[in-house]
């Protein structure tokens, strides 16, 4: 389990909001940034993890907190993932190349991409936050083929 973070070590609400909004945009979720920010400010006394969970819920996301290292290395199977560095900075890792080079965005840099080896990120990381949509999004490719149940459909066919 991830150790609790003391308020002195807590990352500001705006940094978490920036990262979580980028994940919500990645999944195409409609969201209200102001609602998420207010949720984060109101949940500030409950600890950083509770604050991040509340903000994620307001954005339509579900989050899991994972410690870095051990059996769960930083791999492409968990992308996009938010990485909290030892100094408190947040980074959103969006891609990992075959050569081990990660594409990431740092909080507060307005979406500018940076490239660093994933081994360096794993060495400096203190926690990984995996955010996914809270519920499945409708698939526009399949929806036209799915019809609602019609009552008396057999009778209508037989009486034609």
Predicted regions and their residues:
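Membrane-integrated ABC transporters
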Residues: 1-160
């Amino acid at each position: 389990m991830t150790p609790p973070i003391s308020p002195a070590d807590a990352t500001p609400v705006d940094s978490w909001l920036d990262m979580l909004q980028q994940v919500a945009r990645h999944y195409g979720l409609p969201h209200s940034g102001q609602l998420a920010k207010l949720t984060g400010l109101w949940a500030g006394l409950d600890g950083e993890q509770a604050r991040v969970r509340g903000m994620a819920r307001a954005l339509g996301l579900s989050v899991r907190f994972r410690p870095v290292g051990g059996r769960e290395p930083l791999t492409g199977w968990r992308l996009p993932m938010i990485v909290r560095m030892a100094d408190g900075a947040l980074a959103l890792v969006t891609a990992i190349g075959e050569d081990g080079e990660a594409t990431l965005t740092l909080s507060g840099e307005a979406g500018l991409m940076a490239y660093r080896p994933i081994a360096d990120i794993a060495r400096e990381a203190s926690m990984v936050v995996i955010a996914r949509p809270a519920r499945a999004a409708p698939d526009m490719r399949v929806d036209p083929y799915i019809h609602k149940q019609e009552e008396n459909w057999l009778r209508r066919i037989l009486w034609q």
